Amino acid sequence: MDDYRYRDNYEGYAPSDGYYRSNEQNQEEDAQSDVTEGHDEEDEIYEGEYQGIPHPDDVKSKQTKMAPSRADGLGGQADLMAERMEDEEELAHQYETIIDECGHGRFQWTLFFVLGLALMADGVEIFVVSFALPSAEKDMCLSSSKKGMLGLIVYLGMMAGAFILGGLADKLGRKKVLSMSLAINASFASLSSFVQGYGAFLFCRLISGIGIGGSLPIVFAYFSEFLSREKRGEHLSWLGIFWMTGGIYASAMAWSIIPHYGWGFSMGTNYHFHSWRVFVIVCALPATVSMVALKFMPESPRFLLEMGKHDEAWMILKQVHDTNMRAKGTPEKVFTVSHIKTPKQMDEFIEIQSSTGTWYQRWLVRFMTIFKQVWDNALYCVMGPYRMNTLILAVVWFTMALSYYGLTVWFPDMIRYFQDEEYKSKMKVFFGEHVHGATINFTMENQIHQHGKLVNDKFIKMYFKHVLFEDTFFDKCYFEDVTSTDTYFKNCTIESTTFYNTDLYKHKFINCRFINSTFLEQKEGCHMDFEEDNDFLIYLVSFLGSLSVLPGNIISALLMDRIGRLKMIGGSMLISAVCCFFLFFGNSESAMIGWQCLFCGTSIAAWNALDVITVELYPTNQRATAFGILNGLCKFGAILGNTIFASFVGITKVVPILLAAASLVGGGLIALRLPETREQVLM
């Protein structure tokens, strides 16, 4: 088996380590053994010397001789690191000059829309499951715990994808890993619309979340490396508009597709493709279109230069220059750059020979090598010279996510709560009624019947909705083709009564006494209650919430390079905290919608500034990795926020409001300890 070799990220191993040791030592030992032949006893021959075992004194002397060589190796390593840092600093300033020469024009705007679609796919993913659930729960007969897991699994997938794919983008390239990310999302999101079982649907949404989770870190790192210092803050903020567009797109598609139950088909009695599945496929379109368009875009030249690929990077920069100059009407302008500084390479992967081991072993070695490189890179972000910036950013990302995602879930839940309270206030109560020989074939809704007596009554082809029969006596009654939602019989006596083709299952009769009563041919299917109302208001709330961030996006884009990143983060988070206190006055649906729009509109500026400063604080070989770590932590904060805030709906508004406000104030003040990056070149 041929030997395979790879050089470590930081080349910290001396040549004398086990993987690089040669046979010279054995040859010396054999020679030493030969020399001792024929010596007399006065030579103090060491026992075992004839077996080639070196004397302890010889070992000590060898170690003494090797110590300087190890020190030289470490010194050379330090010199190499210092030289590389000088090269990177020189490259950063030279690259800034080159990007200025290339100009900002058609190429950047084309890339802007391609990457914007990828960011839009991330925004869509947040809403897909929540919009599809009211219809999907009926098809899959989902309990509350299963619905909660579906909402959770998307964030878990996005968290894992941000960690993994963000790290890979710093090793394999922005374009390659982003294409992989979008392909995973598009394929598994589409597949999830066809699968019938809950487990398969859950798995597909998990993998889809992993795919799209890597898009946001890569998109911002990728686009920033084509922007000059003067344009970076503004245009990265403009890019954030596409995340808002994703929410608008998902809301509009849900509004226009899901209520149309005829938009589907059935194959036999077991396979049903309903309108919510059409909605899931439509939501995969942004990722699909972005993936196809990305094929025509080049790799980041800044990344290629970091990898030592000078010629390829030069060709791409020339393409950027020529594209922009042609669009400006000056095609004769020549790209004057002939040579670009490339950093000293310290990380090299040597391809394994095809004759080395089996295909499985070769791929395993490749995987372990890449994994080690990504892991070391992540540790360098957390424990290296950037650890303090990473810690501060982690706190800011987490507090922002906890409050923002927590409140964006709390708003629609509170609106539902207000709807339920209003509905309950209109409930009709019938006490001691006596009905004899009646035929009832209309809908009974939102009623309570107590201590009544129904004799020889027929309930035919009717619908019970939120109806409670309590301490009621049924005698010689007949129920046929009856459907129900949230309907129960409590402490009732049911005598000589027949139930034919109904969904009044046994769990709907609580402490009831049956006398000579029969159940015939009960309805098949799910035995759970689901609301029949469409979620028009929830779609509208999400639509308005997404649309409300547009003014904040525009303002943050125009002011990002004027007032700086830190003032934008701190100011936006503090203003958002003040807006939280207005929620105490949100005692109706319309008021809650208005305060939601205000909160989303003020907080978006902090998100945009966070994206920009995260990109600018880290060098090229750690940029996507650090962004992925922080974005993964953001999704963890979103999970906690959703769980904590939802648990207080209908109980108290004080805890969610104070928690959100405190998180925003704390995060905004801590963010001021970060360095300002407005005048900084990309390292």
Swiss-Prot record:
Residues 132-148, 204-205, 259-277, 412-535, 587-592, 650-653 are extracellular. Induction: Up-regulated upon Sv2a depletion. It is a multi-pass membrane protein. N-glycosylated. The N-terminal cytoplasmic domain is phosphorylated by CK1. GO terms for biological process: chemical synaptic transmission; neurotransmitter transport; regulation of presynaptic cytosolic calcium ion concentration; regulation of synaptic vesicle exocytosis. The modification Phosphothreonine is found at T36. The modification Phosphoserine is found at S33. Disruption phenotype: Mice display no particular phenotype. Single knockout mice survive significantly longer than wild-type mice upon exposure to C.botulinum neurotoxin type A (BoNT/A, botA). Mice lacking both Sv2a and Sv2b experience severe epileptic seizures and die immediately or shortly after birth similarly to mice lacking only Sv2a. Single knockout mice bind reduced amounts of BoNT/A than wild-type mice. Single knockout mice are significantly more resistant to C.botulinum neurotoxin type E (BoNT/E) than wild-type mice. It comes from the Eukaryota. It holds the Pfam family MFS_1. Keywords: Cytoplasmic vesicle, Glycoprotein, Membrane, Neurotransmitter transport, Phosphoprotein, Receptor, Synapse, Transmembrane, Transmembrane helix, Transport. PANTHER family: SYNAPTIC VESICLE GLYCOPROTEIN 2 (PTHR23511), SYNAPTIC VESICLE GLYCOPROTEIN 2B (PTHR23511:SF2). Interacts with SYT1 in a calcium-independent manner. Forms a complex with SYT1, syntaxin-1 and SNAP25. This is Synaptic vesicle glycoprotein 2B. The lineage of its organism: Eukaryota, Metazoa, Chordata, Craniata, Vertebrata. The gene is Sv2b.
